[in-house]
Amino acid sequence: CGHSFKQEESDEKGALDNFVMTEIDLLKRSNFSWCDLFGDDCALLAAGFKAWAGVFFLEGRWYAVGGFERSPVRLLGVGERTVCLAQANDWLNEQESDDAAHKSRRWLNELPTPGQLRYLPPEARADFGLTRYQASALLTFKFNKHAIQRVVHAANQSYLEAA
């Protein structure tokens, strides 16, 4: 119709009243369970059936890393813990279905399989509270440890060279 709608200008700034920020606990809201691999909160890993993601702390920075079936381990992000955890969680949700997340959560109440126990170190086999999911996370880390270290150390070196 060709009518020109005029935007009313105002000198008032759009100030917010009663604004409150709330921290969201991504670990609790995730479709996957995040395992603290070594009990020091510096290495967390979640696993599905086809993919896994982890966040690892090195020299003051967090690194988000992911793996998918037979694809190479990849760097997902570098930065603060919450940001890396969000990146890793998002990536894992993109790779896995909701059904896989729910099936893997069932493993939180099941004992490790004999096959899992065979590959775990003696101290993990002696942990009678260990679940099938925790065993899966530990084994995922064990089988991908060198690739994870390579990706994290390369990213750390790049950061140091840029600084």
Predicted segments, located by residue:
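Polar/charged alpha-helical tracts
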Residues: 83-86, 90-94, 126, 153-157, ...
